[in-house]
A protein has these predicted regions:
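Short helix/strand-bridging catalytic loops that position acidic/His residues to coordinate divalent metals
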Residues: 218-230, 272
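Metal-dependent nuclease catalytic regions and adjoining charged, substrate-binding loops involved
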Residues: 230-233, 238-311
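Metal-dependent nuclease catalytic cores that hydrolyze phosphodiester bonds in DNA/RNA
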Residues: 56-196, 303-308
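Polyanion-binding surface elements
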Residues: 1-22
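Glycine-centered, phosphate/nucleic-acid-interacting loop/turn motifs that mediate DNA/RNA or nucleotide
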Residues: 30
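Conserved catalytic cores of phosphodiester-cleaving nucleases, focusing on short active-site segments
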Residues: 197-223
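Short helix-start
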Residues: 6-10, 33-55
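DNA major-groove recognition helix of helix-turn-helix
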Residues: 27
Length: 311
């Protein structure tokens, strides 16, 4: 059975949009690396070689989140998984959690308010019924069937309103966000690998990218713990790379952090050069792991096979 990461010359030709003879010439010229199990066996081309020979120009665009998800390429979330292990990368994607849905609502709330619109135009509070009862379930199902707006729990709805109020009171928000491009999608190549990112706010006149985060604790101590737990350093570096691919320069990267419960404090942070450099190494290692996987060179997909001493 042929390895899914290896293509025959016909498949490679189709992927590259050239003839089979052209693929053979590229192999003979050393432009494409191929694998043979023995001298007379057919050439098999690693998927990584196809990606390397189908370059894409860095570009910026606007699209829906669903359209962005359909784009081929590694994003910050996948890089974070690769940084843990190949098995984490290969695992099934996480489903959207309630906290993620709340995060989307905050973004929408900001955009609606900047446009002079009400949050209620797009979101509505779920009816206060006991869905454990037949009558309550029927009433809720009827509400869902006729409601076109996004439904939130009452506490989440109120949290989003108060979080937005807090964000709008922060001076850094008004310095950057009103003139920024919102949810800019960037596609580019990293060392021959297709890459993508979706930036919350990017303001080219002041060369700044802002990522909005909700957190339980927006204090310096609390958010530093979140950076470690959620690998936000990798995200910051990845977004800086994305921005540089289309503008030619690296931006200042800021996290706009707002607490998701009272008192809804808001704070802005940037990462030290040491943290960004550490993330650079993590990303480079993750990309090398990914390329080795595409080339069929990975035999262990976990952490390590030897005994490791911890201290």
């Amino acid at each position: 059975m042929q390895d899914a990461n290896l293509l025959n010359t016909s498949q490679a030709a189709q992927a590259l949009g050239v003839s089979v003879d052209q693929v053979r010439r590229m192999i003979n010229a050393g432009q494409i690396r191929s694998i043979q199990t023995h001298e007379r066996s057919p050439h098999l081309i690693p998927t990584a070689e196809i990606l390397r020979n189908t370059p894409i120009k860095p570009r910026s665009s606007r699209m829906s989140f669903d359209e962005y998800c359909e784009l081929d390429g590694l994003n910050a979330s996948l890089i974070k998984r690769l940084n843990k292990s190949l098995n984490h990368y290969l695992a099934a994607p996480l489903e959207q959690s309630a906290s993620m849905a709340k995060g989307v609502a905050i973004h929408d709330s900001i955009e609606l308010r900047l446009a002079g619109k009400s949050f209620a135009e797009k979101y509505v509070v779920a009816p206060n019924v006991d869905r454990r009862t037949k009558a309550g379930k029927e009433e809720y199902d009827k509400f869902v069937a006729t409601e076109t707006r996004t439904i939130l729990k009452e506490e989440d709805y109120n949290d989003v309103i108060l979080m937005t109020e807090s964000i709008f009171k922060h001076p850094e928000f008004w310095r950057i966000v009103p003139d920024a491009e919102v949810e800019q999608v960037i596609t580019w190549q990293e060392n021959g690998i297709r890459a993508k990112a979706r930036l919350d706010y990017s303001c080219e006149p002041i060369q700044t990218v802002v990522d909005l985060k909700s957190a339980q604790d927006a204090s310096p101590y609390g958010f530093k713990k979140a950076i470690t737990r959620y690998s936000y350093d990798i995200q910051a570096n990845w977004y800086r790379r994305a921005y540089q691919s289309v503008t030619g320069h690296y931006p200042e990267f800021l996290f706009l952090v707002v607490e998701n419960s009272e008192p809804y404090n808001c704070a802005v942070y940037k990462l030290s050069e040491e943290l960004l450099h550490s993330a650079e190494l993590k990303i480079n290692n993750s990309l090398e792991l990914y390329k080795a996987y595409l080339n069929g060179e990975i035999y262990s997909k976990g952490y390590h096979e030897d005994i490791m001493e911890l201290s």
